[in-house]
Every structure is written in structure tokens, then in C-alpha cells.
Amino acid sequence: IDFGCGHGWLLAELAVDTEIERLTGVDFDDKCIAGARRRIGSAVGPRGTDKVKLLEGLFTHRDQDFLGHDVVAAIEVVEHLEPPQLDAFVGVAFDYVRPARAVVTTPNAEYNVVWHTRRTRGRRHPDHRFEWSRNEFAEWSQKIGTAHGYAVYVVPLGSIHPVWGPPTQIAVFDRAR
């Protein structure tokens, strides 16, 4: 399940994989859902879209359609959430869905000096509520993993600047058995 699926980039890539039986994308923006539908249809054709369900709504509230997924993805999403929404996302993803694996990516705030982000309050996008440093993201990820029974590893994504690190960072959460 792709929480905050946007225009369906990840879902379109995954939809072509014949070993994946079921995909769900969730986004609150109807234009994003429409874009995802088109992108996935272009990638796999009309028959391939049968295994993809797109939901217009919030992933901060429990929905039965979220259940039964092996993986939760939140790709460049958490930074768009206010603290109460972030807590709600964590509850839905890790307590309600409880997947075998979750993947969360977010910008590395330290890297912003490389991109000169002064016009957006030092952030990459005007809608970002926050951006975490590498240490902040690692601490948040470890806290979530410990609280919900997941082993966590955090890895860089993108070219690594010698001082500021990577542009983005990934936390992979594997549920303890």
C-alpha cells in the first residue's frame, strides 16, 4: 500500500511486476488519484489495472481497505504532515496495518544548503511542515521501530555530499517475528 501515492509513480513501477498480486494507493487529492489511474493504465494496460485499487482519502484514519498488505510505503510524504497527523499515520501504518515491512523516505534537511532553498523557508517545498536532519530521522525511525516491534535500518538515497550527506533518506522497518 502506497500512502500518499501522488500521481502513481511507484504504483506504476510495481504494477508491471507479475509476482505482486495486489496494490493499493491512497491520496487525498482527487487530481493525484486521476493522474495515478492514467499512469498505471499506461504502464500495464486495462487488464493490469485490476490488481490496483486507488482510494481518495486520508491514510491517517483506519480503513479496512488498508488491511492485508505486506508492505507500507510512504515516499516523501511524512514531511507534509503536521505532528498530530504524523502520529495518526504511525498508528495506522504500524498498529493497524502492521505490515511485514514499511519503507519511509524523507528529505535530508542538511542537504538543503546545496540546493539554496531560501525561497521556501529553507525547505524544499512550501508545503513541507518540517524536514529532518539525518540524526533526527534516524532517532524518529528508531523510536517508532522500538515502540511498534520493528527492526529499523536507515540508508542514504542519492549522491552523498561529503559534508551534508544525501539529498534523501530511507528508513526500512522490518517487523520482528
List where the protein language model places each region.
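Hydrophobic adenine-recognition pocket in adenosine-nucleotide-binding enzymes
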Residues: 77
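S-adenosyl-L-methionine-dependent methyltransferase catalytic module, highlighting the catalytic core
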Residues: 7-9, 28-69, 73, 81-177
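Conserved SAM-binding motif I beta-strand of class I
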Residues: 22-27
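Conserved class I S-adenosyl-L-methionine
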Residues: 1-6
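Conserved SAM-binding loop of SAM-dependent methyltransferases across substrates and taxa
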Residues: 7-19
